Amino acid sequence: MALNACTKLPVARLIRPSASYHPAISSIRYYSAPPESTIPAAKLKYIPTSGTYPKGFLVSGTHVGVKPTNKSTPDLAFLASETPCAAAAVFTKNKFQAAPVTVSRKMLQRRSNTGIRSVIINSGCANAVTGKGGMEDAEKMGAEADRCFDTPSDGKGGSSIVMSTGVIGQRLPIQKILLKIPTAFDGLGSSHEHWLATATAICTTDTFPKLLSRTFSLPSSPEVEYRMAGMTKGAGMIHPNMATLLGMIATDAPIAPTLLPSLLTKAVNKSFNSISIDGDTSTNDTVAVLANGAAGGKEVTSESSEDHAAFQKVLTEFATDLAKLVVRDGEGATKFVTIRVTEAPSEIGARKIASTIARSPLVKTALYGKDANWGRILCATGYSQISEPGQPINEVPEIIPEKTSVSFIPSDGSPELKLLVNGEPESVDEARAAEILEHEDLEILIKLGGGKEEAVYWTCDFSHEYVTINGDYRT
């Protein structure tokens, strides 16, 4: 097949469903577990059996075989808008940024977040730290996706966001990918199965595809039903600073391109930037949102409007739910843990404390062992504000030991278990503590007693499997 085989496909071709998609059924953790591995029974409840997807967006998941060991599972995701749309993205702050991060950022800047047609994603290879050749590969992926649309050039260059995820330091099998992009385009569709296959295609060590959808309304057009759908991937190397983490959100609401970047940034700060699995920030972190306005209604153009506030709330809540799915699929994780810091002098200080506890190996291993070792929580709280050795302790106003309290909040609605109250240890009922720690969900509450600000982080525990998965990652 020639690389430009889909150059003249009409837009109408986009709406033809194809039988070439691959539903997510098995072989998840493809790169660290045997191919016959199936989705764990405990995770099946997080996979939707149906969805309500935004108008004017079509998706596909196609098998390329980016990793030689992957013989049949989708590893190329394609999302297309039937009309050019507004888009925005936030990217990793890791200094070794992957080629697709650089290419996509420059493309969005060049186009001022307008005229975007698609997102193309491969899993199995991160295309990070791959030099000039890797940059050219990312550009070729975007260009090949662009060629699939029968639209004249607007003179602004490419219009496709490119993402990659997988092993760092290896070049993409670019010819295999380029040959399959027309196939992926030809297989675009709007069914639930198409969306699920696309969510599967971006997975690496994930044990299940992460897909959500919902409907919402805006104050100025209450009669219009808007839709939002999104997918994310990530199970390890998760401590976003904008895990390996990718996220893609699409909506048919009419949002002005000038507003999307700030809307997404605020949503990500309260969601993807508030999760941690292992404390490592990936070279490839990217979360993108696309809005094509296909549902109609009044365009949201003002930051001071009720529509803007309503959409911000919807986007933030949606992104938060997606981010939580990443934590629930933490590599080897057995627990979903909410870290809530309250009564802090500042939100920044509260976030530092929550973040430090969330990535503490000692806290996480204690949770896995069902050990109510609150001393580790207190220890992480105490050093959270210290950025460098030798920093004077009087520069840390956030924490007053004699005002600090720590509790476990059970997920079954039963009373909290107080571990430390105003700096004084409680007589802990170890049997009760063990009972609480048997649950999959747990909240750790830290009250600082010094203010009114708070912050929330979501994390998981560390198990033996985490070491096994990451020790075997490249094999």
Swiss-Prot record:
Keywords: Acyltransferase, Amino-acid biosynthesis, Arginine biosynthesis, Autocatalytic cleavage, Mitochondrion, Multifunctional enzyme, Transferase. Pathway: Amino-acid biosynthesis; L-arginine biosynthesis; L-ornithine and N-acetyl-L-glutamate from L-glutamate and N(2)-acetyl-L-ornithine (cyclic): step 1/1; Amino-acid biosynthesis; L-arginine biosynthesis; N(2)-acetyl-L-ornithine from L-glutamate: step 1/4. It catalyses: N(2)-acetyl-L-ornithine + L-glutamate = N-acetyl-L-glutamate + L-ornithine; L-glutamate + acetyl-CoA = N-acetyl-L-glutamate + CoA + H(+). The active site is at residue 244. The record marks 165-166 as: Involved in the stabilization of negative charge on the oxyanion by the formation of the oxyanion hole. The record marks 243-244 as: Cleavage. The alpha and beta chains are autoproteolytically processed from a single precursor protein within the mitochondrion. It is an enzyme of class 2 (transferase). InterPro entries: Arg_biosynth_ArgJ, ArgJ-like_dom_sf, ArgJ_beta_C. GO terms for biological process: L-arginine biosynthetic process; ornithine biosynthetic process. It is found in: Mitochondrion matrix. Substrate binds at residues 204, 233, 244, 331, 470, 475. Its main location: mitochondrion. Its EC number is 2.3.1.35, 2.3.1.1. Belongs to the ArgJ family. PANTHER family: ARGININE BIOSYNTHESIS BIFUNCTIONAL PROTEIN ARGJ, ARGININE BIOSYNTHESIS BIFUNCTIONAL PROTEIN ARGJ, MITOCHONDRIAL. This protein may be expected to contain an N-terminal transit peptide but none has been predicted. NCBIfam families: ArgJ, PRK05388.1. Heterodimer of an alpha and a beta chain. This is Arginine biosynthesis bifunctional protein ArgJ 1, mitochondrial. The lineage of its organism: Eukaryota, Fungi, Dikarya, Ascomycota, Pezizomycotina.
